[in-house]
Amino acid sequence: MIYCLETMETNYKYTIKKDPEKGILLVNEQGEVVDATDILEKCGDRRVFAFDGKMGAGKTTFIKHLCEAMGTEDVVNSPTFAIVNVYEINANRLPDELKVESLKFKGEIYHFDCYRIKDLIEAMDMGTEEYLYSGNYCFIEWAEMIEPLLPEDTVWVKIEVEENGERSLSFEV
């Protein structure tokens, strides 16, 4: 199932492949290998991304790849116990083609793992709404735990494990 807002109209689907030399590759429907930031570019000004997938589907792995493609030099790992990790974007580390104003890769990235959040009160007490409405990128695992707090234009990204073991990634904007 793909989560979407009623105003969404374009579907995107990618295959996530592992390459022994290059690491994770994102392949679009035309079979072209694209940068992970291709997803962000297609979503325009949206900054909050809710990642949906079963345990072990690759949510954290893909978010790590995405953060690195955005220019962070920080160690990206699962914030399971911290609930939120903050990564700085180093725009100087980005390739020239990604230093465009429309992508606005600057500031901080907030990476949430909401698996351990007990209820909305706990989420609000830790200041979740301040992160979500900060204008910075927010990548959220197990976002259904805080769904009522999410902005209306949140992009729901579905990661599924296919029968052949490859991962597929889909979203709508």
Where are these regions (language model features)?
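N-terminal pre-Walker A segment at the start of P-loop NTPase domains
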Residues: 11-38
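Short beta-strand-centered segment that lines the nucleotide-binding/catalytic pocket of NTP-utilizing
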Residues: 72-87
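Hydrophobic anchor at the beta1->P-loop junction of P-loop NTPases
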Residues: 51
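Conserved lysine of the Walker
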Residues: 59
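Short phosphate-coordinating micro-motif centered on Lys-Gly-acidic
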Residues: 12, 18, 102, 118-173
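Short, basic, low-complexity termini and linkers enriched in Ser/Thr/Gly/Pro
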Residues: 1-15, 89-107, 173
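Walker A (P-loop) phosphate-binding loop of P-loop NTPases
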Residues: 56
